[in-house]
Amino acid sequence: MYPVRDRTAWILAQRQPRRAAPDPYVPHGVFLEQERLASGVIAASGVVLLTNRECPWHCVMCDLWQDTTRESVPEGAIARQVEQAVRTWSNAGPLPSQVKLYNSGSFFDPAAIPPADYAPVARQIAFARHVVVESHPLLVGERARGLRDLLSGSLEVALGLETAHPGVLDKLNKQFDLAQFARAAEVLAVERIALRVFLLVNPPFLDAGAGLEWVVKSAEFAFACGAGAVTLIPTRTGNGAMERLGASGEFVPPTLAQLEAAQRSVLALGRGRVFADTWALEPFSACAHCFAARRDRLETVNREQRDLPPVPCAVCGRA
């Protein structure tokens, strides 16, 4: 059973051995995607998954620590990673108008991203009209303002709310409450920094059947806090802790149908852009025959921001 106290120690105890230490001068991933911007334009978005020190918060569902370093990376390492990303994008064609700097934690954690790298990174992505970084709500403040002032384009900060269910949020070990999240969102609004919110579909500790209800309530809370976009992430296993919670009945993985329903229901709110996370969706699908078409449909809805008819399948019986 999941403990009431010392949750971080329990979470860490479930981990498998770390992979080989990553090179602090090489990004974990670099790719391009298409995203509908706040303006309504569908544009190229360059994504770089930065290599840096593990996040100091140990959320029960997180597996991103597997590709992080144990120590802070040297000054200049992040700038070199971004330089490699820009070179990769340039080799693929025109540079993207939006850049996402994701780092398996918080961009504003100085132990993860040295503040001395902000200026050289900003210079390297001066071509970007819009830049997205991610952060823990408790780290939103002066460093966010500093980065905003260095960028040529506008700044957006993605915050992982995960859920607006107070009891579940506490058990996730996020170590903030809804009031603290709302204050971070207010700081961003005052500083004219856009807000994106990450939400989980079927987080652990929810009553059976309450997943859709609470992802909609969580989206309503996020939009009320000023979010211009929410990303719906199906809760995954793979970090040890989630497997234990599944075995104890405290977590039931979402299905592809539940992700589709969440996207449809949150989009129907009409409050902002809604993106379904389609990374590594195969484990959530029960039918290999219609999986690719259903994933493509989710991605089309992401781009067009309008609901589409469900994908029929003669094999699994979907209408």
Positions of predicted regions on the chain:
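Active-site-proximal loop/turn and secondary-structure-junction residues that shape catalytic pockets
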Residues: G105-F107, P137-L139, T163-H165, V201-F205, ...
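Auxiliary Fe-S-binding modules of radical SAM enzymes
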Residues: M1-P27, E33, L37-A38, F223, ...
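Conserved C-terminal portion of the radical SAM core fold
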Residues: A179-A241, L259-T278
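Acidic (Asp/Glu)-rich catalytic clusters
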Residues: T88-P94, V121-A126, A144-S154, E186-R192, ...
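Hydrophobic faces of well-ordered beta-strands that scaffold small-molecule active sites
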Residues: A44-G46, S97-L101, V131-V133, L155-L159, ...
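Distinct, well-ordered alpha-helical segments
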Residues: A111-A119, V140-L150, A208-G209
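N-terminal pre-triad scaffold of radical SAM enzymes
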Residues: A20-T69, R87-L101
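Core AdoMet radical
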Residues: W65-Q81, A85-I113, Q124-V140, S154-F181, ...
